[in-house]
Amino acid sequence: MRCDNNYSFSILFSLLLILILDSKVVSLSTSCQSKSVCGNINIPYPFGIEKGCYLNEWYKIECKNATYPFLFKMGMAVVNISLPGDDGYNNPVSYGSIRVKIPITSIGCSRDGKESGSVLNFTDSPFYFGIGNSLVAVGCNSKASLTNINPSKVGCELNCTASKETLPSKSIPFFDKTGCSNNKLPYYSSLCTKNNGEDERSCDGNGCCIAGLLDSEAPQVIGINIESFDHGNSTKLECRVAFLTDDVSPFSNASEPKRLFAKRYATVSLGWVIQTKNLSFVNSLSCKNTKEYDNSTYNIKLVTSCICNNVTISGTDYANCGCSQGYEGNPYLPGGCKDINECLRNSYGQRQNCRESDTCVNLPGTFNCIGNKTRVTMIGVGSAFGILVLVVGIWWLRKFLKKRRMSKRKRKFFKRNGGLLLQQQLNTNKGNVEKTRIFSSRELEKATDNFSESRILGQGGQGTVYKGMLVDGRTVAVKKSKVVDEDKLEEFINEVVILSQINHRHVVKLLGCCLETEVPTLVYEFIPNGNLFQHIHEESDDYTKTWGMRLRIAVDIAGALSYLHSAASSPIYHRDIKSTNILLDEKYRTKVSDFGTSRSVTIDHTHWTTVISGTVGYVDPEYYGSSQYTDKSDVYSFGVVLVELITGEKPVITVSNSQEIRGLADHFRVAMKENRFFEIMDARIRDGCKPEQVMAVANLARRCLNSKGKKRPCMRKVFTDLEKILASQEDSLVNIENDDGADDEEEGMTMINIDDSQTIYVTAPAPSIVASSSSSDVQPLFPHPTWI
């Protein structure tokens, strides 16, 4: 085949199709391949010797003595098995053939003179008589004919004379001698030859005659009959033989019938196909049928390796398959048809020749001859493709190295940000720590728009909080810590561990953390309504202006701190209680947050000894002097928050008369001592509040702000008292009596009378009981710097 330069783009397209060809090849097992030869005869699939190596029993070959193959179900010796296209014609719809030995029919050759022979019957099998077979009769004065086929009269007549010229052949042809012109089958036999009018007088009726078995609809039943006519010239019955064969070249008038009878067999060519009762096998071949192939485009035909055609033999449907033009191999194996490299040889075994100035290029199913100009174009295209592959390779390598570098950095950050310490803490607290999710840095960057400034919710001494949205739709608060040195990583890990231990409705929930970034990051549940400081000290028109809501908030805070101090798995000191760390949700429910400086202590310890940390106005003055932080230090900070709720003032105020800057706690204690409480009471809560109730809370706040920690009530006591105050009925008369003689260093008794039915006494622990606490109160623990 020769193509000009206009097919350049077709070549490129075909080369592309090579890359997308299905590479799946279902091959027989190694055991089947090693047993695919019997003697010197190849046994191709669907035929096979061992079980599992043949399609079904019709194709089973019995190899006797490892030398002689037999068609097991038919009991016939096999001479050769060929696949479609093995003849070299490479016709995609030719049939496979199997040559077998059949008995010779004779009369007058045996001692009893009886006729021998049998009817050959292949009904319901995948085998039929091929169109390359001929009826050969040898002897004198007889007629040989075929039976069980249409037309019914098929045969030839034998006469013996001294001269060939005086007696023409009496052959009665069934088809024309050549077997091509009247063929009605949709395929051609590999043994079909054209009649060129040559003189074929070697077996012409004088002692030998031939009738071609042609133009039949693939007969499966054939018998042979020999009829003698001696015309009374002899009383002795001479030997005569007749048989079907696919090879007539050895026979001539000189052949002796007794010699042929002694041979006892002749070879006949049988065509074989595949029964289509079960289409699963044919469909598994992925071959196109002839109709699909004929309707396909040229490029599709080039990459179609095999074709199957449906035929009907004796009323039964069969299929025969073959490798398409430009392919060779076994069409009955998936992927068994392979492309022929026409630049080395074509389907006829010859090498394709291009001009010396051209280059032969093999293509799927064909080839092309490329001229010099086209070659330059192809070189250019190939070079461009190579450069593209190089660029893509460099890009991929760069991406791989970058990803590897980022992975290495993430591991470095994980270690630097305390990942190993966190794992150790989580393992130490196993069973007490709820499983914390580890977020990837990419996930948090996506959730916060790369930590956009527009997503900032607030900033503090420990870091910046961003609003984010996870892929599952949850809104979260992402706390990105400030850059810290390794000496301060313990505080960050401490916050993760502490929050993992806490499970309380009034404590903000930790969802997870990320340690892959340069600075550590925490992910909390999002609390949408801001913090308590904003609601108290900034102009707003909401429920926090009412005393009932403020009292409810105070109870919630006290409940959370009481849980941290006594109900958690181990006591936890918050160490930074302030109104900005009290968050409110959309229903004004309280959430205590920011545990960066929190500490967890064992049950037999009552304090931490550490470097001073906290927020001005909230820090326990006793903590300043001793550096020992106890649960009563949290009580003091809570007392300041109570005063904020009562007065509406900030924790550090400027006295209007003297312009003196004073802590709110000191200002409150002075006002209470001078009985000026109602002067400092927030005007926004006066309307609608119960003064006795407010006074009861004020006295409780005063006790929380006692300068001596041991005289302050514990958080559980504070929580209980606030719940009782909140539970007082609106029509109840609440009377507060306080020992005015008690100084700031002593604890008085506060009595709250509610109606006539119940009396509640709120009392601090006696000094003698407080003094009897464990000696561990003064045992210093390991100090550590804070993030403040």
UniProtKB/Swiss-Prot annotation:
The chain crosses the membrane at residues 376-396. This is Putative wall-associated receptor kinase-like 11. The EGF-like region is specific to this family of proteins and seems to consist of the C-terminal of an EGF-like domain fused to the N-terminal of another one. Residues 1-27 form the signal peptide. The modification Phosphothreonine is found at T610, T615. Residues 451-726 form the Protein kinase domain. The active site is at D576 (proton acceptor). Glycans are attached at N65, N80, N121, N159, N233, N253, N278, N295, N310, N372. GO terms for cellular component: membrane. Disulfide bonds join C308-C321, C343-C360, C354-C369. It is an enzyme of class 2 (transferase). The gene is WAKL11. Keywords: ATP-binding, Disulfide bond, Glycoprotein, Kinase, Membrane, Nucleotide-binding, Phosphoprotein, Serine/threonine-protein kinase, Signal, Transferase, Transmembrane, Transmembrane helix. GO terms for biological process: cell surface receptor signaling pathway. GO terms for molecular function: ATP binding; calcium ion binding; polysaccharide binding; protein serine kinase activity; protein serine/threonine kinase activity. It is a single-pass type I membrane protein. It catalyses: L-seryl-[protein] + ATP = O-phospho-L-seryl-[protein] + ADP + H(+); L-threonyl-[protein] + ATP = O-phospho-L-threonyl-[protein] + ADP + H(+). The modification Phosphotyrosine is found at Y524, Y623. It is found in: Membrane. It comes from Arabidopsis thaliana (Mouse-ear cress). Coiled coil: none annotated. Belongs to the protein kinase superfamily. Ser/Thr protein kinase family. InterPro entries: EGF_Ca-bd_CS, Kinase-like_dom_sf, Prot_kinase_dom, Ser/Thr_kinase_AS, WAK, WAK-like, WAK_GUB.
